[in-house]
């Protein structure tokens, strides 16, 4: 039971943090991790080149980590 509650809480924090990302970054995270798409399909959906897709994904991960870090330290 405690594990389930902890998982629900962690997922809620993640959803909240994802909602705070810019739309393109949120979609990149979604396509890459939550609804895995091949890179060619994900970059096409975002209208990006391959390098642009990976740069957007990197920015999204960095921003997401910072948001989650701020939430856990405040």
Task: State the predicted function of each range.
Residues 52-58:
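Major-groove recognition helix of helix-turn-helix-like DNA-binding domains
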Residues 45, 58-74:
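C-terminal edge and immediately downstream basic/flexible tail or linker adjoining helix-turn-helix-like DNA-binding
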Residues 19, 23-27, 35-52:
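Helix-turn-helix DNA-binding module
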Residues 14, 28-29:
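Short alpha-helical "packing" element that flanks the helix-turn-helix/winged-helix DNA-binding module
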Residues 1-16:
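Acidic, proline/glycine-rich intrinsically disordered inter-domain spacer in sigma factors
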